[in-house]
C-alpha cells in the first residue's frame, strides 16, 4: 500500500536540524512534494562510532517470513511485538519530512479530500522509524529498509483518519537514537493537536495511488 509525505528541506538544512555528523558527502537526494513507499529516502541513525549519520534507505521494511514489505509499525506495544521489538531496540531512526498527507474517508464512490499536516516551527520535523538490513534474494545485495511508526490520532487528525504518524520531538532526538538496554517507549507520545496545522489541498477522484500512510500496519 502507499503513503505520502513531503520533504522540501535540502540536505544542508536537514544536517543542521538533526546535527548530522556523517554520511553527508556520500549521500545525495533532492527535495520533493510527494514521496511514497518503496522509494529511497534519507534516514538518520547512529553509526558504529556513535555519530548521527544520514543514509539512503528503502521505505519498505522487509521481514523474512512475509513476502510483502511493511511500511508502518504500530507504536503501541512495539517493544513486545514479534516483528518489531528487535528493530525498535537496535534500529531506531528518524525520517525527516516537512508535511504528511492523508485522505479523508468518504462514502463509496465519492471523491476523497486530501489534507496536508505540518508542524509550524519544525521544518523539517522528525518521524519516528525503525530500520534493518535485508538481503535481496534477486541481487544478493544487502539493503537498508525502514518503516514509519504510527499511533493514536490527536484531535486534529481524528476526523480525517484513525492513525497518525509518531513524531519525535526535537528535545528527544538524542535519546531516541541513542543505544539503550530498554526501549524508550515513553518517547512515543501523541503530538498535541495545537502543535500541528492542517489544510485541505485537493479533492481528487479515488485512485489506487491514494492509500493511507497508516494502512499497512
What is each stretch, according to the model?
Residues 1-217:
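Short linear sequence motif anchored by a di-proline
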Amino acid at each position: 500500500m502507499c503513503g505520502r509525505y513531503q520533504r522540501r528541506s535540502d540536505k544542508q538544512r536537514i544536517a543542521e536540524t538533526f546535527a548530522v555528523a556523517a554520511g553527508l558527502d556520500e549521500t545525495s537526494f533532492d527535495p520533493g512534494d510527494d514521496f511514497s513507499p518503496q522509494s529511497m529516502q534519507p534516514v538518520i541513525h547512529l553509526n558504529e562510532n556513535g555519530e548521527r549519520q544520514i543514509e539512503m534507505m528503502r521505505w519498505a521494511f522487509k521481514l523474512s517470513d512475509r513476502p510483502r514489505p511493511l511500511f508502518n509499525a504500530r507504536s503501541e506495544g512495539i517493544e513486545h511485538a514479534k516483528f518489531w521489538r528487535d528493530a525498535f531496540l537496535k534500529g531506531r531512526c528518524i525520517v525527516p519530512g516537512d508535511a504528511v498527507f492523508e485522505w479523508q474517508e468518504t462514502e463509496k464512490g465519492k471523491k476523497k479530500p486530501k489534507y496536508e499536516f505540518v508542524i509550524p516551527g519544525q521544518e523539517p520535523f522528525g518521524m519516528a522509524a525503525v530500520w534493518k538490513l535485508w538481503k535481496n534474494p534477486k541481487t544478493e545485495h544487502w539493503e537498508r529498509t525502514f518503516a514509519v511508526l504510527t499511533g493514536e490520532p490527536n484531535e486534529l487528525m481524528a476526523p480525517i483518519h484513525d492513525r497518525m504518524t509518531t513524531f519525535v520531538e526535537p528535545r528527544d532526538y538524542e535519546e531516541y537514537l541513542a543505544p539503550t538496554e530498554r526501549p524508550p517507549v515513553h518517547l512515543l507520545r501523541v503530538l498535541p493537536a495545537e502543535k500541528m496545522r492542517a489544510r485541505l489541498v485537493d479533492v481528487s477522484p479515488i485512485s489506487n495511488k491514494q492509500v493511507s500512510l497508516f494502512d499497512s500496519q
